[in-house]
Amino acid sequence: MARYTGPKSRIARKFGEGIFGADKVLSKKNYPPGQHGNSRKRKTSEYGVQLREKQKAKYTYGVLEKQFRNLFEKAATAKGITGEVLLQLLEGRLDNVVFRLGIAPTRAAARQLVSHKHITVDGEVVNIPSFAVKPGQLIGVRERSKSLEVIANSLAGFNHSKYAWLEWDETSKVGKMLHIPERADIPENIKEHLIVELYSK
């Protein structure tokens, strides 16, 4: 399955929330696409609810099925609560960290910046969006890329104290992962236990 490149508003309406950020269309049409107005919804099966939650997580973080499954299997064998570890692994992806640091306005934009070699890890260019950032590593912007409009606009006025597990040096345009985020540090509205139940069948 290829990465979804269609209208983000359609996906946001599917889940009934702005999983890609603020969505003006969602405020007007807060019901799934294909449904005419707020008519009575059919009751979704237990499997359907679990599958929906997995899809929401995949769309939110821009991860394909094979990548998502691999992350789940890694989380399942790690210490800790499987669902929380899964979210921590998703949060630790380089594209997500670039987004959380405010270097890019969206995760999709962050993926592009990483893929196009605008981002460094510990001073070395890394162009793999799924690269797993470790505590203590420094995430920066290449010197020649610091003037890019998308980066400058995204960083302008960004609140870098939003996430306690990250810090940012405005002068050098370098961020640091202080520690792995706790579940309370992750603002995404994802019921990770449903994903664990789905994969445990």
UniProtKB/Swiss-Prot annotation:
Entry annotated with the keyword Ribonucleoprotein: yes
Subunit structure: Part of the 30S ribosomal subunit. Contacts protein S5. The interaction surface between S4 and S5 is involved in control of translational fidelity.
Any single GO CC term annotated in Swiss-Prot or TrEMBL for this entry: small ribosomal subunit
Region Disordered: start-end pairs: 26-48
Signal sequence extent: none
SMART domains from the UniProt entry: Ribosomal_S4 (SM01390), S4 (SM00363)
Protein name as annotated: Small ribosomal subunit protein uS4
Stretches assigned to the S4 RNA-binding domain: 92-155
GO MF term set: rRNA binding; structural constituent of ribosome
GO BP field: ribosomal small subunit biogenesis; translation
HAMAP family for the chain: Ribosomal_uS4_B
Keywords: Ribonucleoprotein, Ribosomal protein, RNA-binding, rRNA-binding
Family: Belongs to the universal ribosomal protein uS4 family.
InterPro entries associated with the record: Ribosomal_uS4, Ribosomal_uS4_bac-type, Ribosomal_uS4_CS, Ribosomal_uS4_N, S4_RNA-bd, S4_RNA-bd_sf
One Pfam entry name: Ribosomal_S4
Annotated PANTHER family: 30S 40S RIBOSOMAL PROTEIN, SMALL RIBOSOMAL SUBUNIT PROTEIN US4M
Role this protein plays: One of the primary rRNA binding proteins, it binds directly to 16S rRNA where it nucleates assembly of the body of the 30S subunit.
